[in-house]
C-alpha cells in the first residue's frame, strides 16, 4: 500500500470513528477514490440538519460572547460547535473562541472541516493558534493539524511550527490535506531547523514521510534539502536509501539528486548503498516508469565504473522505445556526454540502436 493510500485510509477511519484496520480492504483502492468517498461523507455530515444549525448560529448573535462561549462548552459540545462554526460571521466566531479554553478548542479542531471555516481560522490570533497546536501535538492529532495548514496565514503557521517538535512536524506534513502547501511550510523553517528535521527523519525512522515532503516542494527547496541531507554522515544517507528502496520512493528521490549541487550529487553517488544491483535496478525502473531519464543521466557519470556497468547491464534489455526516450532526454537537456558514457558500456546490439537514434537527431 502506498503512503498516500495509507494516509487516506487513516483520514476516512478518523471521520467514521473506526479503526484503520477495519478499513484494510481499501488498501487496493486508489487513494483519490478513497479521498472522494471521504469528501462525500464529510459533505453529508456537515450538511445534515442545516436548518437546525442555522437557528443555533442565529441564536449566538443575540447573546453576549461570554454567554455564547459558556453555552458552546457546556451545552453544545465540540462536535456541534464545529458544524456551527462555518455559519458564523468570522469576527463573532473569533470573539467567542478567545473566551474558550484551549483544550475545548482542540476538541473542536478535531471535529472541524477547515475548508468550511477557512475565514474563521484565518482570523484567530497566531498566539492562540500556537496554543491549540501544542495541545493537538500532545494528543498526537496529526491528521487534524494537517487539515489546517492551507488555511493559516503566515504568522499563524509560524506559531504552529514553533509549537511542534521535528517528529510531530514530519508526521503532520505526511498527512497534510493539500500537499501543495508544503512549500510554504518548508519556507518558514531556517537551515538549522531543516537539518534537525533531516536527522530526526533518520533517528525516528521517518524517511518515507520526509521523502514524501520532497516530492511536493519547489525545485529550489528540493535542492536545498538535498544539499543539507548530503552534508550528513553516511548513516543518515544510507537510511534514506533504505527507505527509498523498501517503500519504492525512488521517483521522489531522483528529482532531488538532480536539484542538488554537483558536490552533493557526487557525495550521494559515492554511497556504497546506492551502488548495489537491487538499488540500481529500482532507480532504473523508476526512471523508466516516471520518465526520469534526465535525473538518471545526471547521476550516471558520478557512479564508480563498476556501478555504471551494472546500470548498463540493466539497460541491455531495453527496447527501442526506451532508448528513444533516453536519447530524447539527452537531446533536450544537453546530456550527451552522460549518454555516451552509458552507451559505451552497452552490448553491441544496444550500441547500434543508440547510434541509429543519434543519427535521427543529427548527432552522427
Show the residue positions of the predicted features.
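Hydrophobic packing positions in regular secondary-structure scaffolds
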Residues: 1-364
Amino acid at each position: 500500500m502506498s503512503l498516500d493510500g495509507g494516509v487516506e485510509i487513516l483520514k476516512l477511519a478518523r471521520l467514521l470513528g473506526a479503526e484503520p484496520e477495519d478499513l484494510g480492504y481499501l488498501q487496493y483502492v486508489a487513494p483519490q477514490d478513497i479521498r472522494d468517498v471521504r469528501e462525500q461523507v464529510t459533505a453529508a455530515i456537515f450538511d445534515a440538519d442545516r436548518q437546525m444549525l442555522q437557528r443555533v448560529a442565529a441564536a449566538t448573535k443575540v447573546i453576549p460572547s461570554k454567554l455564547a462561549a459558556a453555552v458552546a462548552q457546556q451545552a453544545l459540545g465540540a462536535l456541534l460547535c464545529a458544524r456551527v462554526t462555518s455559519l458564523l460571521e468570522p469576527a463573532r466566531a473569533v470573539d467567542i473562541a478567545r473566551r474558550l479554553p484551549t483544550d475545548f478548542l482542540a476538541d473542536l479542531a478535531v471535529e472541524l472541516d477547515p475548508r468550511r471555516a477557512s475565514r474563521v481560522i484565518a482570523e484567530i490570533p497566531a498566539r492562540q493558534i500556537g496554543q491549540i497546536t501544542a495541545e493537538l501535538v500532545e494528543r498526537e492529532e496529526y491528521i487534524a493539524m494537517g487539515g489546517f495548514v492551507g488555511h493559516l496565514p503566515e504568522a499563524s503557521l509560524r506559531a504552529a511550527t514553533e509549537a511542534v517538535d521535528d517528529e510531530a512536524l514530519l508526521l503532520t506534513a505526511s498527512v497534510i490535506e493539500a500537499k501543495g502547501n508544503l512549500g510554504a511550510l518548508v519556507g518558514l523553517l531556517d537551515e538549522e531547523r531543516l537539518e534537525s528535521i533531516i536527522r530526526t527523519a533518520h533517528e525516528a525512522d521517518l524517511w518515507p514521510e520526509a521523502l514524501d515532503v520532497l516530492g511536493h516542494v519547489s525545485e529550489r527547496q528540493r535542492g536545498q534539502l538535498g544539499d543539507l541531507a548530503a552534508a550528513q554522515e553516511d548513516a543518515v544517507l544510507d537510511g534514506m536509501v533504505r527507505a527509498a528502496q523498501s517503500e519504492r520512493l525512488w521517483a521522489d528521490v531522483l528529482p532531488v539528486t538532480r536539484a542538488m549541487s554537483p558536490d552533493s550529487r557526487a557525495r550521494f553517488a559515492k554511497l556504497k548503498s546506492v551502488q548495489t544491483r537491487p538499488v540500481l535496478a529500482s532507480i532504473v525502473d523508476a526512471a523508466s516508469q516516471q520518465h526520469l531519464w534526465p535525473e538518471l543521466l545526471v547521476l550516471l557519470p558520478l557512479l564508480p565504473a563498476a556501478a555504471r556497468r551494472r546500470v548498463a547491464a540493466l539497460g541491455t534489455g531495453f527496447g527501442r522505445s526506451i532508448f528513444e526516450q533516453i536519447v530524447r532526454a539527452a537531446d533536450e537537456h544537453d546530456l550527451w556526454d552522460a549518454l555516451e558514457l552509458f552507451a559505451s558500456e552497452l552490448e553491441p546490439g544496444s550500441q547500434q540502436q543508440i547510434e541509429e537514434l543519434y543519427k535521427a537527431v543529427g548527432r552522427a
